[in-house]
């Protein structure tokens, strides 16, 4: 269990299940914010070979990678002398799995008792890579903008390795009907074993200009 107790703020997390509890002076108090960071988002590259139109970073093939030494320096800089380190990091890109030192980055994160999570397009997921990540990852999120893009075998690789798997479904005016179908349970069988599906509305500069409010639910 991970614990942090600071004056009238208390936090407990189970890194295995992902369960967290926060309370204030008493168990009934709900703190507005944490006095020190608990999670950090870290972009380890801006390199990606897929070129999704909705990418909020407009990532491309540029071999722009954060080196392991600098990554470790970032982790160590977040270690408070009194209250300790952040509990989790969310690794993004670019495509994290295209980073040549990705497994080393995961190892360095775990060595500091920080739980790593990451978002991926899933193209490079294999049974071998999922096996290497098993027991080391809090959760993996697969980014899609269509259920047709969601490969069942990629989901199976993660689920069979015991890795908690989420879906990041990126919304646009072109897929709102499908998003509503997801909410109605039309894809429950395909999503069996998924921890959560999260609908995201942000994206590239072009994507953000689309007017989602123009959609009318049939």
Segments (PLM) and residue ranges:
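Canonical Radical SAM [4Fe-4S] cluster-binding loop centered on the CxxxCxxC motif
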Residues: 31-70, 83
């Amino acid at each position: 269990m991970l614990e942090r107790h600071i004056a009238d703020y208390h936090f407990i997390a189970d890194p295995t299940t992902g369960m967290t509890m926060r309370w204030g002076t008493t168990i009934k108090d709900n703190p507005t914010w944490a006095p020190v960071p608990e999670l950090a988002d870290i972009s380890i590259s801006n390199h990606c070979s897929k070129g999704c139109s909705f990418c909020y970073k407009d990532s491309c093939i540029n071999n722009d990678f954060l080196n392991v030494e600098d990554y470790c320096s970032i982790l160590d800089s977040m270690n408070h002398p009194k209250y300790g380190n952040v509990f989790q990091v969310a690794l993004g890109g670019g495509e994290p799995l295209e980073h040549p030192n990705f497994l080393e980055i995961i190892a360095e994160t775990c060595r500091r008792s920080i739980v790593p999570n990451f978002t991926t397009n899933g193209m490079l997921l294999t049974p071998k890579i999922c096996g290497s990540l098993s027991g080391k990852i809090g959760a993996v999120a697969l980014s899609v903008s269509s259920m047709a893009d969601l490969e069942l075998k990629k989901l199976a690789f993660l689920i069979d390795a015991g890795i908690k798997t989420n879906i990041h479904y990126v919304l646009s005016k072109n897929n709102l009907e499908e998003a509503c179908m997801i909410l109605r349970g039309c894809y429950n069988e395909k999503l069996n074993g998924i921890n959560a599906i999260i609908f995201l509305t942000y994206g590239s500069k072009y994507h953000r200009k689309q007017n989602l409010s123009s959609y009318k639910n049939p």
